[in-house]
Amino acid sequence: MPDMRLPIQYAFSYPERVKSSFERLDFARITDLTFEQPDTKRFRNLALAYEALYRAGNMPCIVNAANEVVVDAFLKDKISFLGMSDVIERTMGKVAYIKEPTYEDYVATDTEARRVALSLLSS
C-alpha cells in the first residue's frame, strides 16, 4: 500500500538517493484507489496553507516565504520539525495582509515575511 515513506526518504536523503526496499507502484495493476480527507489537526502546515488560500491576497506569499525560511532552518538543525508551524503561523499574523496586492506588494511581502520569520527564529 503506498504511503509517504518513500517521499519522506527522498526529502531526508536529498540530494542523494538511498536505495530502498519499497515495492514500485504499478498503476496498471491497481484496481481502485482510496482517498481520505486530510487530517489538518495532525498536519498543521496543511491547515495553514488552506487558510492562506482561503484568505487569498498576499497570504499565500507570506506562507511560502515563511515556509522557505523554516525549511532552511530545519535542514540546518536550527528548529524542530514541529516548531516550523509555529513560526509560519506567527509570521502570518505579523506581516500586513493585502487583499488585492500588486506585483510590488508581492515582492515587498516576500521580503518582509522572510525578515519576520528569521527574527522569530532568533528570538
Predicted feature descriptions by range:
Residues M1-S123:
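Catalytic, metal-anchored helix/loop core of enzyme active sites in primary metabolism
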